[in-house]
């Protein structure tokens, strides 16, 4: 039985995304970032309902996850770009929360009195 190229691509994006989630849970932000970027290169748009196999769907937010990883790595401008992109595709509370944290991190700090 042969699998189609589309099925193989679907499998790969999901594997990369799952791998990214595992690295994120471990706090390995750099490896999570690599995995999420690989996933996004195959399936670009953030969505609440992404088909993975047959009738199975997942919540798929690669740009949000990339933004969170950049935030954790203190690369705030890149985080802002990815989180904004995620919100342009599909709003999520998590993306909004981290975008607010990014804005706070980028805000000019007032010197102590």
Q: Which residues are covered by each model-predicted region?
A:
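Residues that mark the junctions of alpha-helical repeat units in TPR/alpha-solenoid scaffolds
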Residues: 12, 52-55, 59, 92, ...
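Residue-level recognition of tetratricopeptide repeat
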Residues: 21, 61, 68-70, 101
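Amphipathic alpha-helical segments of tetratricopeptide repeats
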Residues: 38-48, 85-88
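Pro/Ala/Gly-rich low-complexity, hydrophilic intrinsically disordered segments
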Residues: 88-113
């Amino acid at each position: 039985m042969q699998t189609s190229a589309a099925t193989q691509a679907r499998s790969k994006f999901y594997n990369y995304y799952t791998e990214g989630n595992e690295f994120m849970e471990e706090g390995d932000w750099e490896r999570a970032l690599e995995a999420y970027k690989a996933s996004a290169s195959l399936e670009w748009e953030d969505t609440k309902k992404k088909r993975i196999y047959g009738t199975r769907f997942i919540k798929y937010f690669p740009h949000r996850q990339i933004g969170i990883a950049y935030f954790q790595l203190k690369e705030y401008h890149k985080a802002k770009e990815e989180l904004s992109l995620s919100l342009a595709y599909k709003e999520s509370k998590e993306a909004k929360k981290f975008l607010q944290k990014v804005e706070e991190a980028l805000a000019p700090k007032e010197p102590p009195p």
